[in-house]
Amino acid sequence: MAEFLLELYSEEIPPQLQIEARSHLKQFIENSFKENHLKYKDLTVYSSPTRLTLYAKNLSEKIQIDAKEIKGPKVGSPDQVLQGFIKAKNVSKKDLIEKKTEKGKFFFIKTQPKAILTEDLLKKIVPKAIESINWKRSMRWSDHNLMWGRPLRSIFARFNNNKLLFKFDHLETNDEVIIE
């Protein structure tokens, strides 16, 4: 089982905004873990005037996704509808299976079982989580386009005791904690 530690270092955040940011970050990450079937034991969020920190322990290192059947359009639907389904699911026409149901004959596709590394999933989820924090007032600073509650200076991220590499706007993660 693995651990994940995220620390966002910024200029001073007022106490009420810290509470809201903690709550929002925790909710977003918990929902994302649930959507992606990522198991964990405990997820805690802390804050101080200059830091917002998330710690998750006993994370699965891989997520196993089972094969499943996905229902598509009805057999006899316009070709345009069928092509849209094929494109959306990134399959070819030969992958389609016709099956009879209570409501008629439909096209289905069968997905393959696969494993996703938790590290790869975190690289997608965490930037979205940071971006999604709702601030009552956001500010832009320097020549960056990032709008955030206070100027964000650094992102520390470690998964399973290794640096978790991702980029959020102009910032790249690092594995050094800033002490001031």
Q: Which residue stretches match the model-derived regions?
A:
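Long, basic N-terminal domains or extensions that often function
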Residues: 1-180
